[in-house]
Amino acid sequence: MQVWVNGETREVPEGTTLSALLESLHVGGPGVAVEVNAEVVRRARHPEHQLHAGDRVEIVTFVGGG
């Protein structure tokens, strides 16, 4: 099925969870925030949050600096 990730389409298998998507992209950790269809999904829900065709996923990585 097709989902949008940071504005680009990506093919993922049916039943893909948010955790599986992040793992496949080598993204994760405490400095990452994710929203699906404009709603923030808490990290504790990533393993159970299944993606659906057409979902729009935005992944933001926070980087410290100064």
Predicted feature residues:
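Ubiquitin-like/PB1-type beta-grasp interaction modules and other compact soluble beta-rich domains
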Residues: 1-65
